[in-house]
A protein has these predicted regions:
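Active-site/acyl-donor-binding loops of N-acyltransferases
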Residues: 2-13, 75-79, 147, 151-183, ...
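A conserved beta-strand-loop-helix scaffold within acyl/acetyltransferase catalytic domains
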Residues: 6-91, 143-290
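Acyl-donor binding region in acyl/amide transferases
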Residues: 78-161, 274-333
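Short C-terminal domain-edge/linker segments immediately following a structured domain
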Residues: 91, 99-107, 171-174, 198-204, ...
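Glycine-rich loops and low-complexity Gly/Arg-rich segments
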Residues: 95-99, 164-169, 194-197, 231-234, ...
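A broadly tuned preference for mixed-charge, low-complexity surface segments
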Residues: 107-122, 186-206, 257, 265-269, ...
Length: 369
């Protein structure tokens, strides 16, 4: 069953219609999504996720004239990724005291609704906030909005507060690894980058490129060994329930480092999508590898893979701020807009503390770069 609304937002705007659906399967076919995190396959993967405790799932189909959009919303009671952000920020108590409605998933590196007009965004917020109230959540959180879209969301509906949860990292690939390294802030960083790759080669590391069922065979290793390089903690952010269906997202590929005996040393779970190679998460077998620079070796191999597959952008994802700053990657602030379901100054205060703490966390990392 679906519920449709039709409203005319201004004398000069087109009518926007929207309908709720419990699954993406019943929705009309979509145009090619802007990122892998906006695909139907990504949304479908969250239909059975348990690592993030999702209590209900709601997919909003929006029609604006001939343009169609979909935005997925998730009622979450416990998110390991959100708790990791609280840990990084050093806050002393949980931000939320009840369920939250995220739109879309917090785990997608980029959120928002790329390509949508302001009336469509306004409809998404209005329907999302009404749903958030109806199901008893504290807030609607529109997650991980890149700078190019932030103004549009704020113009559509001013949020009660905003939080930059993390920064993505992007770099132009160029025609070769040498061209990529030439853009590093210092020559010494380039020498170290090459040296660490040679050390991995000398130790017998080889690259395995895994897709589909071959990648699915390694999801348990990504679930248990996922890391955020440079962090003093590594909460269990990912589970096989999450990772296995993500192998079916367009462009999903594992860049795996293997020892000479064929055993797993580490890997990047990636998406080669559009013009970019997205490095979504990393897994490193730290217990066996000691001081072997697996992460840097994989980063070098990722650049090679991006060059070989014609990617123009390397999107190195979130976290690992000091390391990525040393490589001269462009940081991109990802803002999450929070719309409260009722006035709650204490929640706004806690969100402000989270924002400040995360900003300080990133600045400390950059100062170490």
């Amino acid at each position: 069953m679906s519920v449709t609304t039709l409203r005319r937002l201004s004398p000069h705007s087109s009518a926007v219609t929207s309908t709720w659906h419990s699954s993406v399967v019943a929705l009309p076919a979509e145009r090619r999504a802007a990122t892998p995190f906006h695909t139907r396959e990504w949304a479908a993967a969250w239909q059975a996720v348990r690592t993030e405790q999702v209590r209900s799932r709601h997919h909003l189909f929006l029609q604006d004239g001939s343009s169609q959009h979909r935005m997925s919303f998730y009622q979450v009671s416990n998110s390991p990724l959100w708790h990791a952000m609280e840990d990084d920020a050093g806050v002393t108590r949980p931000t939320f005291e009840a369920d939250v409605l995220y739109g879309p998933s917090l785990y997608g590196e980029y959120g928002g609704l790329p390509g949508a007009t302001v009336p469509v965004l306004a409809e998404a917020v209005d329907r999302g906030r009404a749903l958030a109230r109806d199901i008893g959540t504290e807030a609607l959180v529109i997650t991980n909005i890149p700078p190019v879209e932030r103004t549009l969301w704020c113009q559509a509906r001013t949020p009660d507060t905003e939080v930059v949860l993390y920064w993505a990292h992007r770099a132009r690939v160029g025609a070769s690894v040498d061209e990529f390294i030439a853009n590093f802030p210092s020559a010494s960083t380039g020498r170290e980058f090459r040296s660490q790759h040679r050390r991995g080669n000398d130790a017998g590391l080889t690259l395995k490129i895994a897709r589909g069922s071959e990648l699915q065979a390694h999801v348990a290793e990504f679930g248990t060994q996922s890391v955020r390089v440079g962090d003093g903690h590594s909460p269990a952010l990912y589970g096989t329930d999450m990772l296995a269906p993500l192998t079916r997202v367009p462009g999903a590929v594992g860049l795996l480092a293997e020892h000479s005996d064929g055993s797993f040393a580490g890997g990047f779970f990636c998406f080669r999508y559009g013009s970019a190679l997205y490095l979504w998460t990393a897994a490193i077998d730290g217990a066996r590898n000691g001081d072997l620079p697996i992460y840097s070796w994989l980063m070098y191999e990722s650049v090679k893979f991006a060059v070989d597959t014609g990617a123009s952008v390397l999107d190195a994802g979130r976290f690992d701020y000091a390391y990525k700053a040393r490589l001269g990657m462009l940081p991109v602030a990802l803002m999450s807009a929070v719309y409260l379901t009722r006035p709650n100054p204490h929640l706004v205060s806690r969100l402000g503390a989270l924002h400040t703490g995360l900003n300080q966390h990133v600045l400390r990392a950059w100062n170490k770069a």
